[in-house]
Regions:
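Acidic-and-aromatic substrate-binding clefts and catalytic sites of carbohydrate-active enzymes
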Residues: 41, 49-51, 76-81, 98-99, ...
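Substrate-binding cleft of secreted/luminal carbohydrate-active enzymes
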Residues: 265-285, 300-380
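Hydrophobic faces of well-ordered beta-strands that scaffold small-molecule active sites
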Residues: 31-35, 71-73, 119-121, 187-189, ...
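Alpha-helical scaffolding within the catalytic cores
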Residues: 58, 105, 225-226, 245-262, ...
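Aromatic-lined carbohydrate-binding/catalytic grooves of carbohydrate-active enzymes
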Residues: 66-100
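Active-site-adjacent "subsite" loops/lids of carbohydrate-active enzymes
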Residues: 28-54, 120-121, 126-177, 181, ...
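Catalytic domains of carbohydrate-active enzymes, especially glycoside hydrolases
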Residues: 54-80, 181-186, 266-270, 347-349
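Polysaccharide-binding and catalytic clefts of secreted carbohydrate-active enzymes
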Residues: 52, 62, 69, 106, ...
Length: 380
């Protein structure tokens, strides 16, 4: 009898332990804040090392004090790097090709991990410049040698050609350099994929692929995504994408094959759609959009994170049509969007775009502080 009691007791505590671990796992919510090249320009570029590091200290302190646990740091915005690279020149934290005097990425990572904060390295894979100014590209930049080749496209900005195998190799090598040398927790690509609808039509015509032009473009992006995912898997680093929340735009204009990414197990670990809508947006409501994204996930191992538009707080939203004043008339939208997102089956967390709109008082609207206070109520 005593043996039975002991066995039952052991079984009870084992079950309790398993359930406790499971509860901790599912209750962990990633709460991210985007720190973009704009913040890096402001707080690091042209600053001495001590001032620069103190500014980073303040960024991490602010994020931690708001009960956030993920920094999404833009490490490559314009074919550059905020860390010493053998592939890309320094950029965002300094003039292109000029060292800031220390390893900014390593400093961010060490400080984040010291404060129990995750760090995802955020990359723009194809963008070189957001203008057509080729003169701004230094000879240190890998794009420089390709300016007169098919590997670079100039079309309302300067971009790497997604159809090029050399470009795919460049992007993959850049990711490998990060995950091999830095203790990042994740790699995140954003929504810059094909720069225009017909930028590489000649390459398509000369290819031996017997598919439509649209299928060709999807295939070229998918090849790059598979390559990067494979590299991240090898180094046990999560890989995800933060695409435009408009599903039609992704597939038909940007050649972002979200249907395949969310169904297969060879592309991504998480998806973070930029659901920059309110509840009264006339074209797309927040609720409908997050439900659409959840419905696309066929691989249950993929985590759904929702990127939220803190930059709209207190501002008119001209694209919302009849709902253009929603962000002006309300100061609890972010809080309500977080609560609603938590009901999603594959929910893994949320993120806010971007740091300065939350913590830089020179950018505050009349609603900012109240929106933050309301958000705090659901961030215990």
């Amino acid at each position: 009898m005593k043996k039975i009691i002991v066995i039952c007791a052991i079984f009870f505590f084992v079950c309790l332990f398993i359930n406790s671990n499971y509860s901790d796992e599912v209750s962990f919510e990633k709460r991210g804040i985007f720190v973009s090249y704009i913040e890096l320009n402001k707080y690091i570029k042209d600053k001495d090392i001590n001032t620069s590091k103190n500014n980073i200290n303040k960024i991490i302190s602010n994020i931690k004090n708001l009960n956030f646990n993920l920094v999404i740091l833009q490490v490559r915005s314009f074919s550059d790097a905020i860390y010493p690279s053998n592939i890309y020149p320094f950029g965002s934290v300094s003039e292109e090709g000029v060292s800031p005097g220390y390893d900014v990425l390593k400093y961010f990572i060490d400080l984040c991990h010291k404060n129990n904060i995750l760090l995802y390295a955020w990359i723009n894979p194809y963008r070189i410049r957001n203008t057509n100014d080729v003169g701004s590209i230094s000879s240190f930049n890998p794009a420089y040698k390709w300016l007169n080749s098919r590997n670079v496209i100039i079309d309302n900005g300067i971009y790497y050609n997604p159809s090029s195998d050399e470009v795919i190799e460049l992007i993959s090598s850049g990711v490998l350099e990060i995950v091999k040398n830095y203790d990042v927790d994740g790699i995140l690509f954003d929504d810059y994929f094909y720069p225009s609808t017909d930028c590489d039509y000649n390459e398509y015509l000369s290819s031996d692929m017997r598919v439509s032009y649209d299928e060709y473009k999807l295939d070229r992006v998918n090849k790059m995504i598979r390559s990067v995912y494979s590299i991240c898997r090898e180094y046990d680093v999560l890989f995800g994408i933060s695409p435009d929340a408009n599903i039609d735009n992704n597939y038909n204009k940007l050649s972002a094959d979200i249907y395949t990414w969310l169904s297969d197990n060879k592309y991504i670990d998480f998806i973070m759609p930029q659901v920059y809508y309110g509840f009264f947006n006339e074209s797309k409501t927040f609720k409908n959009v997050i439900d659409e994204w959840e419905g696309l996930i066929k691989n249950p191992d993929i985590e759904l994170m929702i990127a939220l538009a803190f930059y709209k707080v207190g501002n008119e939203d001209k694209w919302a049509k009849s709902g253009y004043n929603e962000w002006v008339n309300n100061s609890n939208i972010i809080m309500r969007e977080i609560i609603l997102s938590r009901n999603l089956k594959y929910y893994g967390g949320f993120s806010l775009f971007r740091y300065d709109y939350i913590f830089n008082d020179s950018m505050y609207t009349e609603n900012t502080l109240l929106e933050v206070e309301n958000m705090k109520k659901v961030l215990k």
